């Protein structure tokens, strides 16, 4: 839960621009829009949704949506327990790059495609890490992030490794 001490851009819910009910409705609308666009993409690519490949991708997409929701919502959000980096690396790096390749090429990605997947994953985690470094003071006692576990100096070294790993 963010508070007034948090640095960075203001959020609609935090500032009172949206009510909790409006935010929940917005989440539902965006989830449905994402699911429908994913289904349409799979239908266009595979010509059906009722084969093994599209079904596996539907399950993977549902896991990604569920992971996004559980990241900060619910009684025990994993993004506040220091697991956000791993999730971002998996979903924004490996799943997005390798999944997109599979949707287009209809073939299992070769090992060489792990290179761009890992690069995108590293850069994505780098964005998260910069935000978490910025919020170390305001997050204290509220959530646990990688910079809180390893300290700001360690997080800067980690960030350098992420960016270097992406290159």
What is each model feature region?
Residues 93, 162-167:
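Hydrophobic membrane-spanning alpha-helices of multi-pass integral membrane proteins
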Residues 65-72, 117, 123, 137:
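Short, hydrophobic/aliphatic alpha-helical segments
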Residues 56, 112-123:
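Alpha-helical transmembrane segments
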Residues 11-111:
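Intramembrane alpha-helical segments
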Residues 87, 91, 119-122, 126:
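Residue-level hotspots within pore-lining transmembrane alpha-helices
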Residues 1-32, 121-164:
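Solvent-exposed interhelical
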């Amino acid at each position: 839960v963010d508070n007034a001490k948090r640095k960075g851009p203001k959020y609609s819910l935090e500032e009172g621009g949206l009510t909790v009910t409006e935010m929940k409705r917005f989440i539902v609308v965006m989830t449905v829009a994402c699911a429908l666009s994913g289904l349409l993409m799979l239908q266009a690519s595979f010509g059906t949704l009722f084969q093994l490949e599209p079904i596996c991708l539907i399950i993977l997409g549902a896991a990604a949506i569920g992971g996004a929701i559980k990241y900060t919502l619910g009684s025990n959000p994993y993004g506040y327990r220091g697991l956000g980096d791993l999730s971002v690396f998996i979903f924004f790096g490996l799943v997005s790059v390798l999944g997109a390749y599979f949707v287009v090429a209809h073939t299992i990605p070769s090992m060489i495609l792990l290179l761009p997947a890992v690069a995108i994953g590293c850069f994505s985690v780098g964005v998260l890490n910069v935000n978490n470094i910025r919020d170390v003071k305001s997050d204290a006692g509220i959530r646990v992030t990688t910079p809180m576990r390893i300290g700001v100096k360690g997080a800067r070294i980690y960030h350098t490794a992420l960016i270097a790993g992406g290159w």
